[in-house]
């Protein structure tokens, strides 16, 4: 079954053959497009058998997620070649009183260290000056989402 032949449903799962299966009703906006609405998310995986969660700046390019994070902690090296989860949400909208529906998306798939082209670096925007008091040194990962989970809170 090709992508074009899939039933109109929403949560996406890439099958082992590389096809994409949908398992929930489709929304007006695909989950990966929701990432364009917020600049930061959280990357989760394990390092030396212990789980960790770290903040990362993201952009979406060609259906993949590019992440920029601080290299000083070595998190990018722990993720390289591993399956990771990357999540983002608009839950701060509730705290700021913007109202509307809230959403959270999580993408799971393999990550690899990459070197973005100049245009991709510009899309990331300004980098932080420091992280925990040390100068920010960027590292970049690309996540190829194989599984997608989306949750919404409707008000």
Segments the model singles out, each with a brief description of its role:
Residues 38-70, 86:
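Short beta-strand segments
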Residues 38, 53, 60-62, 79-83, ...:
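Short connector loops at helix/strand junctions that flank enzyme active sites
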Residues 14-18, 59-60:
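Short, basic, glycine/proline-bearing loop/turn elements
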Residues 2-14, 21-22, 89-155:
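Charged, gly/pro-rich active-site loop segments
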Residues 83-84, 124:
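Conserved short secondary-structure elements within globular domains
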Residues 16-42:
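Short, basic/aromatic recognition patches
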Residues 73-75:
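Short, surface-exposed beta-strand-loop junctions and turns on beta-sheet-rich folds
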């Amino acid at each position: 079954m090709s992508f074009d032949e899939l039933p109109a449903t929403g949560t996406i799962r890439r099958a082992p053959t590389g096809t994409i299966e949908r398992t929930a009703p489709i929304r007006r906006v695909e989950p990966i497009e929701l990432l364009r609405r917020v600049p930061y998310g959280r990357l989760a995986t394990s390092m030396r058998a212990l789980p960790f969660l770290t903040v990362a700046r993201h952009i979406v390019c060609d259906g993949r997620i590019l992440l920029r994070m601080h290299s000083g902690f070595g998190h990018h090296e722990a993720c390289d070649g591993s399956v990771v989860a990357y999540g983002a949400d608009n839950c701060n909208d509730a705290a700021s009183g913007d109202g509307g529906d809230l959403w959270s998306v999580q993408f799971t798939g393999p990550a690899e260290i990459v070197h973005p082209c100049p245009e991709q670096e510009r899309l990331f925007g300004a980098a932080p000056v420091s992280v925990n008091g040390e100068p920010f040194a960027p590292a970049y990962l690309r996540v190829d989402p194989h599984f997608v989970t989306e949750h919404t809170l409707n008000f």
